[in-house]
């Protein structure tokens, strides 16, 4: 089951740690959608037909024309710490972001309508869709490894 929570307002230290509020404030996928517009699916990766259908539907409904595989690994990524720092910078883009975790795990942080950060723990089989013009950031977990499929609209160009 997916883990989603409201983050502490001023996280300090390693961004790869959970940064829960105390006491933790868990959020459901429905609440995530209402607060941020972000959509979440847990894909059945063992059912290749259902998986292909879900991804085809995603691509058609959201006009994703291209995709790639992105790997972030402390053992093989050059300047890993710099890359983590770069990816954890808040950003907002004018197009939707779709990501599916195919190995490892990562955190996606999405800013809600009230300026509070919501953290999504994404692992194997998780697919998220972050709406356009939504502030977000990304980091690995302390395991320092994630491999994902990224889906793009044609005009994005990476």
Curated annotation (Swiss-Prot):
Organism listed in the record: Caenorhabditis briggsae
Q: What is its EC number?
A: 1.13.11.54, 1.13.11.53
The protein's name in its UniProt record: Acireductone dioxygenase 3
Query: Where does the record say this protein resides?
Result: Cytoplasm; Nucleus
Q: Name one GO molecular function term.
A: acireductone dioxygenase [iron(II)-requiring] activity
Q: Which reaction does it catalyse?
A: 1,2-dihydroxy-5-(methylsulfanyl)pent-1-en-3-one + O2 = 4-methylsulfanyl-2-oxobutanoate + formate + 2 H(+); 1,2-dihydroxy-5-(methylsulfanyl)pent-1-en-3-one + O2 = 3-(methylsulfanyl)propanoate + CO + formate + 2 H(+)
> For this protein, what does the record note about how its cofactor is bound?
Binds either 1 Fe or Ni cation per monomer. Iron-binding promotes an acireductone dioxygenase reaction producing 2-keto-4-methylthiobutyrate, while nickel-binding promotes an acireductone dioxygenase reaction producing 3-(methylsulfanyl)propanoate.
Name the InterPro entries for this protein. Answer: ARD, ARD_euk, RmlC-like_jellyroll, RmlC_Cupin_sf
Spell out the HAMAP family in the cross-references. Salvage_MtnD_euk
> Gene3D superfamilies in the record, alphabetically?
Jelly Rolls
Asked if Signal is a keyword of the record, the answer is no
Keyword annotations of the record: Amino-acid biosynthesis, Cytoplasm, Dioxygenase, Methionine biosynthesis, Nucleus, Oxidoreductase
């Amino acid at each position: 089951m997916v883990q989603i929570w409201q983050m502490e307002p001023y996280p300090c230290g390693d961004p790869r740690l959970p940064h829960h509020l105390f006491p933790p404030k868990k959020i459901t996928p429905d609440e995530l959608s209402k607060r941020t517009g972000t959509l979440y699916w847990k894909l059945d990766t063992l059912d290749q037909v259902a998986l292909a259908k879900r991804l085809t539907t995603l691509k058609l409904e959201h006009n994703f024309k291209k995709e790639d595989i992105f790997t972030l690994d402390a053992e093989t990524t050059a300047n890993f710490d710099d890359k983590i720092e770069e990816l954890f910078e808040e950003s907002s883009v004018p197009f939707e972001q779709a990501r599916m975790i195919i190995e490892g795990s990562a955190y996606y942080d999405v800013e809600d309508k009230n300026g509070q950060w919501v953290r999504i723990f994404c692992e194997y089989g998780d697919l998220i869709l972050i709406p356009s013009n939504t502030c977000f950031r990304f980091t690995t977990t302390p395991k320092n490894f994630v491999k994902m499929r990224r889906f793009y609209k044609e005009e994005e160009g990476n």
